[in-house]
């Protein structure tokens, strides 16, 4: 239900949140290797997250990406991440392609989609990086977010 870009963005920010105590920057190519994702694609999808102020980037020898100053894993929801990649306002568009689909001018799927999309958006808004990190701590065998073992 989310794009590959959003999936990778969530995994990357989960990784950065787990590393936050080290207070260092991580190169996109190093994260990509650890996360098992294409490096050029990861570098591209991190940029909207920088623009939104969720992460900070720094060029140069000790550069890379990290959570933005003052941002904690509890501050960043999946909605924040996915919206940066996909502009979630588009989810409200009619499933059947009607130019106007509202309670007054509903398509056959309007009520179902309205309820489903509301639940989906609420789930994204109520789930934080901290919760994903907690899952990783409780279930390290899951391999999330890094399918590649740390050497």
Residue map of PLM features:
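Conserved segment of winged-helix/HTH DNA-binding domains
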Residues: 70-96
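Key DNA-contact positions within bacterial/archaeal DNA-binding proteins
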Residues: 40
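A short alpha-helical element within helix-turn-helix/winged-helix DNA-binding domains
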Residues: 26-36
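Alpha-helical residues within the helix-turn-helix
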Residues: 33, 50-51
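Minor-groove-contacting beta-hairpin "wing" of winged helix-turn-helix DNA-binding domains
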Residues: 61-69
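Short, hydrophobic-biased segments on the C-terminal half of alpha helices
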Residues: 13, 46-47, 78
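C-terminal regulatory/oligomerization modules of transcriptional regulators
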Residues: 77, 92-151
């Amino acid at each position: 239900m989310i794009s590959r870009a959003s999936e990778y963005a969530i995994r990357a920010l989960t990784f950065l949140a787990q590393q936050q105590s080290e207070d260092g920057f991580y190169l996109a190519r190093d994260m990509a290797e650890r996360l098992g994702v294409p490096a050029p694609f990861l570098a591209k999808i991190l940029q909207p997250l920088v623009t939104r102020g969720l992460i900070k980037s720094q060029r140069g020898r000790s550069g890379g990406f990290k959570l933005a100053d003052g941002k904690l894993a509890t501050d960043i929801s999946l909605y924040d991440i996915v919206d940066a990649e996909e502009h979630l306002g588009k989810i409200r568009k009619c499933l059947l392609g009607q130019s106007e689909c509202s309670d007054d001018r509903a398509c056959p799927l309007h009520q179902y989609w309205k309820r489903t999309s509301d639940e989906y958006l609420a789930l994204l808004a109520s789930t934080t990086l901290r919760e994903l990190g907690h899952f990783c701590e409780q279930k390290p065998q899951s391999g999330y977010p890094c399918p590649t073992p740390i050497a």
